[in-house]
Swiss-Prot record:
Pathway: Porphyrin-containing compound metabolism; protoporphyrin-IX biosynthesis; coproporphyrinogen-III from 5-aminolevulinate: step 4/4. It comes from Pasteurella multocida (strain Pm70). It is found in: Cytoplasm. The gene is hemE. Keywords: Cytoplasm, Decarboxylase, Lyase, Porphyrin biosynthesis. One of its GO terms (molecular function) is uroporphyrinogen decarboxylase activity. Its main location: cytoplasm. Its EC number is 4.1.1.37. This is Uroporphyrinogen decarboxylase. The record marks D77 as: Transition state stabilizer.
Length: 354
């Protein structure tokens, strides 16, 4: 593989010295870019775009051509695993994901296959290999998966949800069934992420989008427990260097200490968390990624720069911070805003790394 020219993202995740704070944006390959919308139109629909390695590579690289980002992230979806398990994933026009065969019974859980990453999910690995080749060592490639809890919410609810009544009914009325499902999903995620690493991903991230809807004990038992299992099962070194692992629970600020005990290298934090406090709590164990509210990108360039400066000041001196948004970028932000954001981070962070 080509030698890496810019490794400050990987170094920051391992809390090693860097010259400036690295940055990438969740959903940086996405609908806010006109070139993404054009490529998606060529593909026909979202999953066709994910399944075409050349087009998935193209949209992964698009934001890097516009902005001096410090990492690329695989263009894919967290629901590839349940889709490969045969649940019948579809995306309606203007709608979220839907599953034709939601999980409701013991038999349904028992019958779920664990997908072969080089079989039903080979299209993802082909995309990883293609992107890694086309990056030519410019920046590292991030692979990812949804967390078992977050995948289970979609599989049991049959799609997106606001109240999560079906999966919470299973959690409280039949916890053993939910544990069986989560355990199987954890095994599937371990295989999937390790295959991404073998295919060329240089860092991996677990997105626990819906962990924050759980109560305290339930989060530890039904979400974090299974992320811990995944972290323990991952390949942690490849191509002669460490493969850092980042956990991100949206709304998970109260569990940072417990998350840091999993053996991961970094924690993603959303905008509800003060970075100075997070660093004081867990900065001796893990790096932190985040955490600007994506809605700040609707503001003026001066306001964006002000927010960047504030977050950099919150983290303070030293390595161990990857700048990011607190969640995915919105599709209708002004076209110049991401450039202001990225350039401000690189410019204003340098004094913190002397």
């Amino acid at each position: 593989m080509t030698a890496l020219k810019n490794d400050r993202y990987l170094k920051a995740l391992l809390r090693e010295p860097v010259d400036m704070t690295p940055v990438w944006m969740m959903r940086q390959a996405g609908r806010y870019l006109p070139e993404y919308r054009a490529t998606r139109a060529v593909a026909g629909d979202f999953m066709s775009l994910c399944r075409n390695a050349e087009l998935a590579c193209e949209v992964t690289l698009q934001p890097l051509r516009r902005y001096p980002l410090d990492a690329a992230i695989l263009f894919s979806d967290i629901l590839t695993i349940p889709d490969a398990m045969g649940l019948g994933l579809s995306f309606g026009v203007g709608e979220g994901p839907k599953f034709a065969h939601p999980i409701e019974t013991q038999r349904a859980v028992q019958n779920l296959p664990i997908p072969d990453p080089e079989g039903e999910l080979q299209y993802v690995m082909n995309a990883v290999r293609t992107i890694r080749r086309e990056l030519k060592g410019e920046v590292p490639l991030i692979g990812f998966s949804g967390s078992p809890w977050t995948l289970a919410t979609y599989m049991v609810e049959g799609g997106s949800s606001k109240a999560f009544t079906k999966i919470k009914k299973m959690l409280y009325a039949d916890p053993q069934l939910l544990h069986q499902l989560l355990d199987k999903l954890a095994d599937a995620v371990i295989l999937y992420l390790n295959a991404q690493i073998k295919a060329g991903a240089q860092s991996v991230m677990i997105f626990d989008t819906w962990g924050g809807v759980l109560g305290h004990r339930e989060y530890l038992d039904f979400s974090l427990h299974y992320m811990h299992k995944i972290v323990a099962g991952l390949i942690r070194e490849n191509e002669g260097r460490k493969v850092p692992v980042t956990l991100f629970t949206k709304g998970g600020g109260m569990w940072l200490e417990a998350m840091a005990e999993t053996g991961c290298d970094a924690l993603g934090v959303d905008w509800t968390v003060n970075l100075a406090q997070a660093k004081a709590r867990v900065g001796h164990k893990v790096a932190l990624q985040g955490n600007m509210d994506p809605s700040v990108l609707y503001a003026s360039p001066a306001r964006i720069e002000q927010e960047v400066r504030s977050i950099l000041a919150d983290f303070g001196e030293g390595s161990g911070h990857v700048f990011n948004l607190g969640h995915g970028i919105h599709q209708d932000v002004p076209e110049q805003s991401p450039a202001v954001f990225v350039n401000a981070i690189h410019q204003f962070s340098q004094p913190y790394h002397k």
